Amino acid sequence: VEDQTEIYNRSINEDTLRWWSEQSPEALEEAMGDNGRIPLKECMEILYKFCWNRRAVWSNGASFDCVVMEHAWRQTSDKPNPIPWQFWTMCDTRTLWEITGVSLKDGGHTTSHKAVEDAERQAIVVQKAYTKLIKAELVAPAR
């Protein structure tokens, strides 16, 4: 957090701190602990390479996750266009779940708000939703 507030002048939201204080110790340690952290700039560079030129970028609400990451890229990157995706490649899992009737509960139990577990569960649910759409012949299988 220090490199984000001191180097990049990012702010800390009191509501977010309060929300995190109500989470499980395991989730809090994973998110805020000092277990192998890398600086924000390095993290965003790694994530940029992973996301670059993807056909789709999925997030749990296109108006939050992607917006937060785009803001961090703009603050930390030296690239003229630091965002690794185009706006038309952003996909919202909530919309997919709504039209297919699946939910996060279909992804199995995880420790709430542990980032890797949340991402894995969301990916499982996206796959289940796509399977429903393919079986209903509403979308073609990916090539």
Task: Report each predicted region and the residues it spans.
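Conserved non-catalytic scaffold segment of RNase H-like nuclease domains
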Residues: V1-S59
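Pocket-edge positions in alpha/beta enzyme catalytic cores
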Residues: N35, W88, T111-K114
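Residue-level signal for well-ordered alpha-helical scaffold segments within enzymatic catalytic domains
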Residues: I46-F50, V67, H71, E98, ...
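Substrate-recognition/cap helix-loop segment adjacent to the acidic, metal-dependent catalytic center
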Residues: Y48, S63-W88
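Alpha-helix capping at helix-to-loop junctions
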Residues: N53-A56, R74-D78, L96, V102, ...
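Acidic, Mg2+-coordinating catalytic module of metal-dependent nucleases/exonucleases
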Residues: A56-S63, V67-V68, L104-R143
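Short, flexible loop segments at boundaries between secondary-structure elements
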Residues: P82-K105
